[in-house]
Amino acid sequence: MYRLLYPMRTFLVVSGNGEEADVMTADWLTVLSNKPFMIGVAVAPKRYTHKLIKKYGEFVISVPTLEMLKDVWIAGTKSGPSKLKDMNITLVDSKKVATKSIGEAVANLECKLVDEQIYGDHTFFVGEVLHYTYNEAAFRDNKPNLKYNFLAHVGLNEFATFEDKIHEM
């Protein structure tokens, strides 16, 4: 029944460090607070990312575009750090956390884990955003530039982008 809420924006969750670094695709993410800036992401306990977020107490949310679709697919269908060699991404130093950011992403939000709760078959990790970086052209005038083809997951292996048209009321 959760598919009734789709399409949903798709994100990449980076966790771990060094040889344990991992990237996972996630749709179940939401903003929880503006001040302080907090976001939450639901991760199943069987995911390698789950283990790393608990171990390191931090994670990075990266915002992919259509140009990163193959990497998004790999991150969502393969498990463990070995998948990074199949991906065409660059892990770059973050400013406030040890977990890396993704150089090709149009935005990276560096989070410190502040809470976690189990809801059914997922753990909801709450992160306080300590720092963020973004491509200024992709977020002009403090809103997304839809020409950057932000990804939304439709279901299974189907993704969509947003029409390059804003409807005003």
Model-derived segments and spans:
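Basic, polyanion-binding surface patches
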Residues: 1-169
